[in-house]
Amino acid sequence: MLLTTGRKEKLSVSKGSEIEISSQEYEYGSGNVWYCVILEENLAKSKRKKLSVRHLDPLLKYDYSPPLIKTTVHRFMRPVPPPDPFPEVDFEEGDVVDAAYKGGWCSGSVVKVLGNRRFLVYLRFQPDVIELLRKDLRPHFVWKDEEWFRCEKQQLIESDFSAGKSVEVRTKVDKLGDVWAPAMVIKEDEDGTMLVKLKTLKEEEVNCTKISVSYSEIRPSPLPIGLRDYKLMENVDALVESGWCPGVVSKVLAGKRYAVDLGPNRESKEFSRLQLRPSIEWKDGIWHRKEKVSGSEESSHAVEETAASTRIRITVRTALKEKKALGTGINVRTTRSSSGAMHNPLPASFNGGDVAEAGRVSVTVNETPLFETAALSGELGNSLADVVMNESAPVTSQPEIAAPKEFHPSVVLGVAAAVKTQGKTTPKKKLQAMKNQKSSTNDSVGEKVSVNKRKRGQPRKFIVAEPKQKIGVSGNNSKAATIEHADMTDDDRPLASWVHTGNSSSGQSVSRTPDIGLNTVVEKHVDIVETPPGRESTMVLPFVKKSQLWKVLESMEVFKVVPQSPHFSPLLESEEECREGDAIGRMVMFSSLLEKVNNLQVDDPISSINRIDECFLKLEKHGFNVTTPRSRIAKILSIKERQTCALEELKAVEEKITENDNKRRKYEEDIVELQRQEVLMKEAKVTLDNEIARMQSQAAVLDQEVQNVDHEFQAILAAPWK
């Protein structure tokens, strides 16, 4: 639809006039190309049908070389359109414009505003989409019946494949197969295909190829993503010379570089992170991400560990001297199946209870609680046997209370057995004494031991039979291996009595049971279970657990999920009657703090989170393991700091948006005011034109009267005297 401008203009066809001509006859409002020319001859004097013209550059107004047009006919001419009334105002999407392109003014429409006074323009003549600056554009005017009209703004239809949209086209490349090349949509052809223009990836190449493709060979451009790391066997698209080629990451190299297998031939090439993106598929109008490569290809890169059956050979020998009965030498031989485990037996020899040399095992019996145990039954009866993990270092005794051991899963399996001895025992009685140990009431270390039978194919396990035991490891890293025993009566004694009287409540020697000696070799298949690190069953506390609340606390889900073994040593400074109550309060406090952490909200103040962290610090002094909750609190505080910064930036951006919006509204008001003034000025101009025309007519009459008077005057002077 055409909109009138109220301006009329006649075509001047005299020599030297600047006009615009078309290369073909045009229809009003249709797309065409108009060239700026200078007439080289007058239309009235020329007896030829065609007129000679001189082609001008559409912007610079000098001769265009080489000229694209030299002659024209009258019906292809029109005056030069009126100048742009608002050259400082940017065009909007859908505006019909003329673009200075290839020596002429090509009509088209704006399909996208790029910013910084840059626009994507769809050209109707020789269909194309090009990027142009504001200075290379002008409003599209139509000259009809000696009057200028403007075209109404077009309504653009937005879609994934509308003109000017960035897309990717599937092309075939030798050795690489399918490659997705970047392109831009121009228009939809009548046969249902899409006319697109391939984008070049080389800066030196300017001309872009136009091709028609079907909808199955085209897809929108994926959204850009930030820099990220890629994993082994991950599906990616790699940027090659002709586009994005699908591939699989085969190697992760140093310096954020990757080796990628491309195409059906699996050609391997190296790429940086900037040249890769996750591989995604356009299907049914939705992006689908390809899954990681699995199967035989991935299994070659994975490492899988399987448990092997273990055969343990144990040799137990008694001490020869009564005064050194605290140590018992044990020879341990560990063998494994063909899974690649060690087959080295530990050399062991023992003399008179002395600590063995490197590779030997010695065991000490103490009256302190134990932390981790595993037991053996059968010919050994109820005698204790602890399985420890060591890397070719000896297991040595440790007096008094031993420090908890660290759990190391990748070490050699060894066995240590704890036996209370007193006096000497002949070798003939060793095995019998071992069998009769079940009925001994004086032996405080009578433990239930069982060896589970397992079905074929099941993993081997160690059965944990008694919680009041502790295993430590001593090797090159000074880790001690200690097996200790505690009487039931000593567990309930306060820590103060231990400090004054020592580890034994009776003040007697540690060794209180009859001497039990063994000098035999027992071979058993034992199932192995790795005891979780940090497992503790009994702790020497500064008070006696008398309240029934302890069972309730220990049965709570929170202490099953996050096991705790606090020592409550700071309570020694409190009154003895208040210690148990204070300890229960701290257990409840730990549970409530974990619940508070779980119930934290994103809008909670940082001060309240810091107070929770300070409470955990106080509980840590009492032996609570607060590493996990404090780590979570640290992450939450970090997120809160980021949230605070983001909120401040958001506030600043919103203020800037409000400020710019106010400016935009002011500009709109100014534009409306200018348009109103334009209408008023046009009306005033029309009034002045009419007034000028009236006055010109009056002036003509007066001029004629003046001429008549002059003629009369001359006639009177020229009249004869006769």
Curated annotation (Swiss-Prot):
UniProt protein name: DUF724 domain-containing protein 7
Coiled coil region boundaries: 645-712
Molecular function as annotated in GO: protein homodimerization activity
Miscellaneous information on this protein: Plants with reduced expression of DUF7 show a slight delay in flowering.
All copies of domain DUF724, residue ranges: 540-720
InterPro entries: Agenet-like_dom, Agenet_dom_plant, DUF724
Subcellular localization: Nucleus
Entry's Gene Ontology cellular component terms: nucleus
Biased composition (Polar residues): 434-444
Region (Disordered): 424-449
Gene from which this protein is expressed: DUF7
Keyword terms, alphabetized: Coiled coil, Flowering, Growth regulation, Nucleus, Transport
GO biological process, one term: flower development
Annotated PANTHER family: AGENET DOMAIN-CONTAINING PROTEIN-RELATED, DUF724 DOMAIN-CONTAINING PROTEIN 7
Disulfide pairings: none
